[in-house]
């Protein structure tokens, strides 16, 4: 190949390359995690509590001593009931063991079988024991009963 075809002559016409095409600037790439102004990356973003009122305070659940008017025993028309006028005295502590029950079978002092609520609302621990003993059962404070079977229970304070 001849040398005259492979190179431009020195000092001859040499044109600079054309400028690159003009393109719009790309938008900024989002950073991860998202910046704090859009929730800080937690989905969903935290609630805006500035325009909301707080929820009302919770109330204390009722205890086992109130509202005991059970209607009595058949033909007497309510002669043996407690109307709850003693201020709702609680026989069992609030919390897990809060259900007053008369249980006929005790297993190792913690599990009880054949449990039923007392026939009327007891006035105190000794009254609770008397109500249950009338049916041949024992006064116990239990977790919420499930079909009257296999309850976790503890002794009633003041039932002796």
From Swiss-Prot:
Compartments where located: Secreted; Secreted, Cell wall
Coarse class of the protein's main subcellular location: secreted
Induction data: No transcription can be detected in the presence of root and stem powder of Shanxin poplar, nor under carbon or nitrogen starvation conditions.
Key words, A-Z: Cell wall, Disulfide bond, Secreted
Disulfide feature: 92-141, 102-132, 103-115, 142-153
GO cellular component: extracellular region
Function of the protein: Aerial growth, conidiation, and dispersal of filamentous fungi in the environment rely upon a capability of their secreting small amphipathic proteins called hydrophobins (HPBs) with low sequence identity. Class I can self-assemble into an outermost layer of rodlet bundles on aerial cell surfaces, conferring cellular hydrophobicity that supports fungal growth, development and dispersal; whereas Class II form highly ordered films at water-air interfaces through intermolecular interactions but contribute nothing to the rodlet structure.
Other remarks in the entry: HBF2-8 is the only class II hydrophobin gene for which no expression has been detected and that does not contain a signal peptide sequence, thus it likely corresponds to a pseudogene.
Family, as annotated: Belongs to the cerato-ulmin hydrophobin family.
Subunit structure: Homodimer. Homodimers further self-assemble to form highly ordered films at water-air interfaces through intermolecular interactions.
Protein's name according to its UniProt entry: Class II hydrophobin 8
